[in-house]
Amino acid sequence: MRTVTVGTRGSALALAQTRWVVARLKEEWPDTDFRIQTISTKGDRDRAALQSLAQKGDKGFWVKEIEDALLAGRIDIAVHSLKDLPTEQPEGLEIASIPKRVDARDVLIGKDGMKRLEDLPSGARVGTSSVRRKAFLRAYRPDLQILDLRGNIDTRLAALGTPDYDAIVLAAAGLIRTEMRHRIDEFIDPDLLLPAPGQGALALETRADDDLSIEVVYAIHDHATDDRVTAEREFLAGLGAGCMAPVGAHATLKDGVLTLEGWVGALDGSQVIRATTSGDPAECADLGAELAADMLGQGAQQLIEAAHR
């Protein structure tokens, strides 16, 4: 029996994602022994420094140590949340498989009487860790108090038990993967709040010359998800932005047409830019790049740079 080592961060969400991946791979390769190895990243060790790291252009704080282990041959496959992965991979590595996306949307969880974004009273205190969500909420509901809230899912949910927060906004996928879907009060429609590029999708990364591992992970590759997230990530790359920028993107496929929406907002909520394009899914990368160019022409770069000052 051959052994394949799968690397991941050690958080509850990362482990839940990786166990899901391993279960799918085991269905395809029953004679293979998959072993999970947890790896601590810079983002895990120093969450307080994330904003300053982003300002310095460091885009690999959730993945670098895992990619180093992959390059060194200590692991064979890396499992990442796609939205945390920089748009360019280190030389010698590639995204070899993208499984079917779970749910790209953001969700709201609130105290009694505050279960929907529309129901939040003026002055309600809303916690989130994402600059994208902060920018959106300040633009959409300038009457709310938008507060920083970091930590894992359990930490954020526990914050609702304190007087400091009336509601929190976070990604649906994390709650679904950790079997806490029942805690969700409202799924926020992407027509209102565009998710982060790649949100809800996973990336399985391998060494580019490791044909065996590439074959193993490609067995659970989902082409439709790949087309959608490729458009979203090319949009992000075209803007020259990273995962901590106030940027949203969401691609949909219907009747053979891929539609991509992009959003960039000022962190204080004073300005937003939103645009849409559509075309052949086979041209998903070009669609993302074209939409980025369109929005750069409308001043998107200035909003992104201002958010990192």
From Swiss-Prot:
Alphabetized UniProt keyword annotations: Porphyrin biosynthesis, Transferase
Keyword Cytoplasm: no
Example of a GO biological process term: protoporphyrinogen IX biosynthetic process
Domain of life, source organism: Bacteria
Pathway this chain belongs to: Porphyrin-containing compound metabolism; protoporphyrin-IX biosynthesis; coproporphyrinogen-III from 5-aminolevulinate: step 2/4
Keyword flag Metal-binding: no
Protein name per Swiss-Prot or TrEMBL: Porphobilinogen deaminase
Organism: Deinococcus geothermalis (strain DSM 11300 / CIP 105573 / AG-3a)
